[in-house]
């Protein structure tokens, strides 16, 4: 009887073994469940975020899909602490097994499955966990759950066959989702502790490894004490495995859990406007006129130029990988090396924030109690209502409700119904109750700004600020938005005069001048300068004091068409510039970036340099895919450049830019202020021998502005931002900018004499053939 029972038992065991062998064989062949092909096992389909680096080696941000913000890090760049913590906690016999730890598996089956001990530990190895992360989909039914573990075991064994232990550890840490948009160990190290993986301390590594058991349960941001308790468990495991001593464990367990939390978000961090601008440039499609509306023809024109002439524009569309597919900015793990300096970028953002916060107080005070605020009193109430109504119709809320079939009356009612919301303020985000319509008006109150700084020799853009806060004000006023430039355009008229034989020392009578415009009507510019009326003054004095009468006199001696042509030669691409006599006062719109690039010609001996944003692009393995060089063009003669340099220095030392000196900038520099009608726009352009920077400040709409010159002129609105920035840049010796650096003029140079040895041919390019046909 006993023999019969034993025989039956052995037959049963044999059958079970055969069934198990058949099941595992079927899984390996892919007959049961999902088994990835060999190619996928050898080359897992990772989605790595693209990293954006500053010139000084800092990570400015990443481009990724929302849940795949993973940045690759190699084994040699991992701290031993993270490796030791992971092995000690998740798989202490990791170096000994081939994917499945039989001892741990048996222990888990007996203690957890039979004895029902909850704290008996798991049986999964690191390799099994990796196989689950890589290839195991979620089980939707009992049958799928039944085969899920055997499938993971088979994949784990195959992974051990194709990869070294170091590679498996690296893959695991790169793959794991640590929550809070921190996918992979590199992003997690920065998100929670503000450091690189190689710099993780023991207790920090233990915290992150502790999350591997259940990231939601042990989220250190939400559950600090619970996460600390789990960290201490990991530290104890490290002590048991011999990675740390008992004394080290005790001292580390006593530490509080301190985070340096930095949530990775494209709307947060440094250079947000720049990163968004760069993203648009890199992923741009080939322009198709059919995709542009009538009011977008200027953009179509610029995109067409950039597609043909700018290798960075549409780079992901123009270039392909080895397999013939186009590069994906969000999943291919590219490394974009930009020209921005993180320190200078921080100084620029701080300068914008500090000044706008102060200026906003004056603006609120001026508009307090005004019924039409933030708009000027010159508008009628009907005009204000129409502007706000147009803003409502452009809002996301309006479009969503309209798409859902809501009537105009229903939409209007929703916009006039108070609700709880969080709004921006310079003191921090505020919770309040207001109607959506009131929120539109509220945000209109805030002044906007655009700032850019670049090296006039290399074209490297060092700082880029498109507005006060990207999270709330996403329209970029550095390179995308354009505003009227006012008097900052005058240097181009004076340049044209120098090219046509004028000298800074030529004298002109300071009286009102009347010109005949293109329609045959008289045009007499107003003039705020009441000094030396009727006296003879120099051309240099006219520019230094931004005098409209002297400007009008020069315009009377020159051709508006030639001025328009020269402006385009300086890199301004606005096709709507009208060649009228009033062109000399800057009634047309230019971006801050275009203006900064144009001004590089003055300290650079007549050579204009286009902005350079990226120096090279590498793939995930560090192979260089593309390099980029600055675009340079001689736009005026050396002689004219020297003369303009002399006059623009006088603007700062003797004229309207004198506030720069009072605010603490002592460097040799030139510059120009600019203010448009009714103080709608305030500008300041300034340059030293090694840095050209420009700033614009104004309201979202042109009818939002100061009503007085005290705070509304360019010297009050924009100049202080430039000054705050330069004081910090020149004060930071690590940047290498010397406050004592001077412009290199020829020895004994006299701008009143024309030195033929300095003369160069004025080179104004003809329009590029064929571009005009794009708009026919």
Identify the residue ranges that each predicted region occupies:
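Active-site-adjacent helix/loop patches that line small-molecule binding or acyl-intermediate pockets
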Residues: 125, 134-136, 141, 145, ...
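N-terminal type II signal-anchor transmembrane helix
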Residues: 1-53, 113, 359
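A penicillin-recognizing enzyme superfamily signal
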Residues: 338, 342-358, 389-455, 460, ...
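Short, glycine/proline-biased beta-turn/loop segments that scaffold the active-site neighborhood
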Residues: 256, 480-536, 610-625
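Short, well-structured active-site flanking segments
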Residues: 95-105, 183-186, 245-250, 498-519, ...
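Active-site SXXK
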Residues: 85-87, 238, 348, 458-459, ...
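Peptidoglycan glycan-strand catalytic modules in the bacterial/periplasmic cell-wall system
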Residues: 2, 46-49, 53-304, 313-316, ...
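Non-catalytic structural connector segments
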Residues: 118, 245-405
